[in-house]
Amino acid sequence: MQDLEDAPASAELAATTAALLGEVDHRVKNNLQLIASMILLQQRRTEDEAARRALKSVLERVNAVATVHRRLFQGDPHLFEAADFLRDLTGDLAASAGRDDLQIELDLTPVAIPAASAAAFALVASELLANALKHAFPPGVGGRIVVRLTDEGAVCVLTIADDGIGMGAEAAGFGLTLAGLLAQQLHARLETAPADPLSDRPGVRATVRVPMPRSGGG
């Protein structure tokens, strides 16, 4: 009997919660769009090429966070489908790079990571892929980038590898530094090494092993 009496109150609470979440979604989305618009406007008005590149990088980071937010509110708010995000990210960054001479291969295992880790994971992936697109291949030099996500149970492993010119062009960049700091938020470590050490184009393999929470009570 008590359950029947509580049902209307529970339904009202659920409706109120849904309305509040919808309002939060709307406001966050609008704020991210406003930030992106301001960055884009400043980029278009800036004549210095280095400043334009820096603003483009910031815009890519904001867009990555916006994509995370959209996916969380459209799906399970507690879990983030990393493989689906990586498909979107790859398409967005490849289009932005405008490099028809680059081939990007995806090898993605479905992995759901906790929502609390979503933004850091997304930014790590964005930095690593953007770094490869920007620095691994000089103008006129094509190549291949592989984006791989695997589920090893206790960890999920993100690997982004290229067959570009190697670590000399990429090792000291801000993007890799930022990716390393963000990996620490995931209790992970960014590891970089030549993808093919014996080749005249050794490339770079960047790997992040992200610990996954255990399910169950053991």
Label each residue range with its predicted role.
Residues 102, 154-158, 204:
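Short beta-strand element(s) in the Bergerat
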Residues 168-196:
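ATP phosphate-binding glycine-rich loop and adjacent ATP-lid/helix-beta elements
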Residues 142-154:
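Short beta-strand/loop element within the Bergerat-fold HATPase_c
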Residues 58, 67, 71, 78-95:
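Short beta-to-alpha transition helix within the HATPase_c
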Residues 9-12, 16-20, 32-63, 74-78:
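Histidine phosphotransfer helical core of two-component systems
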Residues 7, 11-21, 25, 80, ...:
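Conserved short strand/loop->alpha-helix "switch" segment adjacent to the catalytic nucleotide/phosphoryl-transfer site
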Residues 153-177:
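Glycine-rich/acidic phosphate-handling loop/turn and adjacent ATP-lid/helix
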Residues 201-214:
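Short C-terminal beta-strand
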